[in-house]
């Protein structure tokens, strides 16, 4: 299920952003957020390192449907933040053709909104963690931890860092893949290719 969902998401994002690396990075980092939330649930609830805060001893195991629920919610929430951020970066890159300018504009225009939305969700799930049902507590705390990590370390640190390091390769899409996905080439790339002979002749 995870592999199929990741593949479908990759194809849709590749078509939307006309890139191979951006959707690959997006899916990989979302899965990192999910894995972090699963690890938090295992350490706190299954192993009991912190479950005493809720007055509950270590469960020793986690019900099978709990990780599935956390994955479903967190994958959707994290991907929503990622698409929101990448859409702004892609828009800026198409205008100016600069990856660094795209990163600055993307973080500057979406950072506050993403952080505020994550804070609201985190508080909501923290309140849900007071429910008497243990499975609900595990789901709520796992989602809260995953959202905090995703909105801070992942979204505000790793995403802009990786995009800046990859530079122009963020926007690379082979012609064959572009035809397969039925998308147009980037206007910025076309302009640069047309200007290259003029630069050489000068």
What name fits each language-model region?
Residues 1-202:
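Membrane-embedded transmembrane helical bundles of large multi-pass transporters/channels
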């Amino acid at each position: 299920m995870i592999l199929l969902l990741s593949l479908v998401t990759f194809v849709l994002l590749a078509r939307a952003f006309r890139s191979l690396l951006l959707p690959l990075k997006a899916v990989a980092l979302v899965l990192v957020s999910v894995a972090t939330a699963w690890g938090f649930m295992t350490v706190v609830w299954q192993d009991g390192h912190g479950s005493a805060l809720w007055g509950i001893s270590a469960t020793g195991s986690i019900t099978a449907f709990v990780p599935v629920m956390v994955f479903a919610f967190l994958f959707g929430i994290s991907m929503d933040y990622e698409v929101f951020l990448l859409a702004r970066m892609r828009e800026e890159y198409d205008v100016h053709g600069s990856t660094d300018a795209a990163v600055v504009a993307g973080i500057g225009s979406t950072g506050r909104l993403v952080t505020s939305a994550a804070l609201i969700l985190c508080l909501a799930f923290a309140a849900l963690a007071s429910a008497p049902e243990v499975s609900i507590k595990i789901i709520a705390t796992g989602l809260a931890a995953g959202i905090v990590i995703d909105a801070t370390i992942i979204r505000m640190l790793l995403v802009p860092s990786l995009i800046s390091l990859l530079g122009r390769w963020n926007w690379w899409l082979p012609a064959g893949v572009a035809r397969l996905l039925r998308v147009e080439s980037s206007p910025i790339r076309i302009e640069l290719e047309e200007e290259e002979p003029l630069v050489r002749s000068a």
